[in-house]
């Protein structure tokens, strides 16, 4: 599973690529774009895994966020070949063994999505 250590996060903080939906863009296309921008890898969609909903505070305001996660299959590219205009977003990239990913990802919702991916691929 392609994972990133977001810029500014401590060593060992592994996360899944994600980002904001662009104007007129569907969630699946956003996910494909973000994977390419943050990892350098091109992917082919397999299926939607689910949504993670959470609330956080930004500049004193509560923000409700929904992040959609998709299962993709590797298509092309080299992990870490991040386009220069996005290199500031990512400190490090790594392939996580799928069986270990639920225990290595830093965020609960992402660990749950990794477990769903593992379950889906084990069928």
Locations of regions flagged by a protein language model:
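Unchanged
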Residues: 21-112
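N-terminal strand-loop-strand
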Residues: 1-16
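C-terminal alpha-helix
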Residues: 116-123
């Amino acid at each position: 599973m392609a994972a990133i250590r977001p810029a500014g996060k401590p060593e060992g903080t592994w996360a899944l690529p994600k980002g904001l939906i662009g104007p007129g863009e569907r969630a699946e296309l956003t996910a494909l774009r973000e994977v390419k921008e943050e990892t350098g890898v091109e992917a082919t969609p397999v299926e939607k895994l689910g949504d993670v909903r959470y609330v956080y505070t930004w500049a004193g305001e509560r923000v409700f966020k929904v992040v959609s996660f998709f299962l993709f299959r590797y298509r092309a590219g080299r992990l870490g070949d991040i386009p220069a205009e996005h290199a500031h977003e990512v400190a490090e990239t790594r392939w996580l063994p799928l069986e270990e990913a639920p225990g290595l990802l830093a965020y609960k919702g992402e660990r749950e999505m990794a477990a769903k991916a593992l379950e889906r691929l084990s069928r």
